[in-house]
Amino acid sequence: MRALSILGSTGSIGLSTLDVVRRHKESFSVVGLAEGHDVHALAEQIKEFRPTIVSVRDENAADELKTLLGPADRPEIVHGIEGAGTVAAAEGSDMVVSAIVGAAGLTPTIKAIKAGKDIALANKETLVVAGQLVSDLVKQNGVELLPVDSEHSAIFQSLLGHRAEDVERIILTASGGPFRNTPLEEMKKAGPEQALKHPQWTMGAKITIDSATMMNKGLEVIEAHWLFNMPADRIGVVVHPQSIVHSMVEYRDGCVIAQLGSPDMRAPIAYALSYPERSESGVKKLNLAEIGTLTFEEPDMVRFPALQLAFDALKAGKTYPAVLNAANEIAVAAFLNKQIGFTDIADTVDKTMQAHEAYTPMELDEYIHADRWARQTASTFISS
């Protein structure tokens, strides 16, 4: 039996993970849960999955959770980013599902790695912000880092059984989001209601906006660089509106191996949890005859400059990826709060990157310093 701690248990990935666990209670147990926003949902999860430790956002949420649980149902309750780290390193778990949204997931994930836990990584920002540090820690601690993002899971599966030297490049697919065919002038007027209508995937608000700007794909390019040791010029992106081909690997003989499946995050989650085996995930079986047509097109870097910004950050290295991510988080939050327009998101990121004097970070604190600087700078651009 594999014992799990789930960071971000009440979010989209967390709920899908628990659905997989629910289907395979003979294979998985839950040791720890961490959430940031929905104490009532966490209380129900505690009653069903009986973790020994949970973390909530702050002391008030901890008090509220205690009132929702009887003494018999009550696990150890901790709070804050330190609490999430305690859950991540909790004794008794052997795998941590890292699904906290944004750079907030970095520190708990590092604590899990240092505690010798295998990582099922849904929090791409961990590698975007501190890819070199995290990669080094994974090697030093002898743990496995298994991708949960559908694209990286597809690449991981498409690489199995092949020699690294035979790989020509990897190709990430992107749905194109809700504005794939929207003229730029109309995109400038788009509000959160339009941007949150993803044509294929059901996800949280932040990642849905990132998909609409194509920043999500840019972050995935940086994540792929660290996961698969692939330089930027050997990572491609192609828009695939049907979201059936999840990504591809091109080999030097001209052959391309791809992984296909219905657009449902439970499939890559089940694969990461069960690896190297496979488990039934509850995902609808793929019927290609019913789908009929699969199409592909080049991404439009003019209408979606966030993707180019991510490639630029990856190529420049140093603290640029951390700054890219932090500025984007601030800009997306401002857009969701209707403080800025849709196209202002990429503009804010661009301005913040241009204002940054990059350096080579060595320690976690140096990555966090760049993250904080970018948040403050992006906030200043937005308020002005």
Curated annotation (Swiss-Prot):
Q: Which InterPro entries match?
A: DXP_reductoisomerase, DXP_reductoisomerase_C, DXP_reductoisomerase_N, DXPR_C, DXPR_C_sf, NAD(P)-bd_dom_sf
GO terms assigned for molecular function: 1-deoxy-D-xylulose-5-phosphate reductoisomerase activity; manganese ion binding; NADPH binding
SUPFAM superfamilies per the UniProt record, alphabetical: 1-deoxy-D-xylulose-5-phosphate reductoisomerase, C-terminal domain, Glyceraldehyde-3-phosphate dehydrogenase-like, C-terminal domain, NAD(P)-binding Rossmann-fold domains
Catalysed reaction equations from the record: 2-C-methyl-D-erythritol 4-phosphate + NADP(+) = 1-deoxy-D-xylulose 5-phosphate + NADPH + H(+)
Summarize where NADPH binds, as residue positions: T10, G11, S12, I13, G36, N123, E125, G204
Task: Give the enzyme's EC designation.
Answer: 1.1.1.267
Q: Where does Mn(2+) bind?
A: D149, E151, E220
GO terms in the biological process aspect are: isopentenyl diphosphate biosynthetic process, methylerythritol 4-phosphate pathway involved in terpenoid biosynthetic process
Q: Which top-rank group of organisms is this from?
A: Bacteria
Q: Which cysteines are joined by disulfide bonds?
A: none
For binding 1-deoxy-D-xylulose 5-phosphate, which residues are annotated in this chain's numbering?
K124, S150, E151, S175, H198, S211, N216, K217, E220
Q: Name its pathway.
A: Isoprenoid biosynthesis; isopentenyl diphosphate biosynthesis via DXP pathway; isopentenyl diphosphate from 1-deoxy-D-xylulose 5-phosphate: step 1/6
Entry cofactors: Mg(2+); Mn(2+)
Keywords, A to Z, come to:
Isoprene biosynthesis, Manganese, Metal-binding, NADP, Oxidoreductase
The UniProt entry, under Pfam families, shows:
DXP_redisom_C (PF08436), DXP_reductoisom (PF02670), DXPR_C (PF13288)
Q: Does the keyword Hydrolase apply?
A: no
Q: Which family does it belong to?
A: Belongs to the DXR family.
HAMAP family cross-referenced by the UniProt entry: DXP_reductoisom
Q: Which PANTHER family match?
A: 1-DEOXY-D-XYLULOSE 5-PHOSPHATE REDUCTOISOMERASE, 1-DEOXY-D-XYLULOSE 5-PHOSPHATE REDUCTOISOMERASE, CHLOROPLASTIC
Role, per record: Catalyzes the NADPH-dependent rearrangement and reduction of 1-deoxy-D-xylulose-5-phosphate (DXP) to 2-C-methyl-D-erythritol 4-phosphate (MEP).
Q: Which NCBIfam families match?
A: Dxr, PRK12464.1
Kindly provide the name given to this protein in its UniProt entry: 1-deoxy-D-xylulose 5-phosphate reductoisomerase
Q: What is the originating organism of this protein? A: Chlorobium phaeovibrioides (strain DSM 265 / 1930) (Prosthecochloris vibrioformis (strain DSM 265))
- Provide the taxonomic classification: Bacteria, Pseudomonadati, Chlorobiota, Chlorobiia, Chlorobiales
